[in-house]
Amino acid sequence: MKNKQEWFHEKTEKVSPEIMIEVQLSADIIARIDLLLKEKNMTQRELAQKLGKNESIVSRWTTGFPNFTLRTLSQLSVALGEPLIQIADH
């Protein structure tokens, strides 16, 4: 029987590098949202209200791997008062 690491490695070695990067970026953004919510002592409900969105949408963002649009990232940055992502200088 395979352990979890072997199973995970077997599944991920078949995934394209582009998808792996996409999943990692989504996970990083979700982690940043969670961190900012905690730092600002803000709930998902409060964030949803600031965005004018349903709380279930915010919940789905933080529990899955959403394909965030630039507009959504911008709206989240404004609502949280800090940038979610930064582009490295050349």
Model-derived features: positions:
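N-terminal flexible/basic segments that precede or flank functional cores
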Residues: 1-35, 39-40
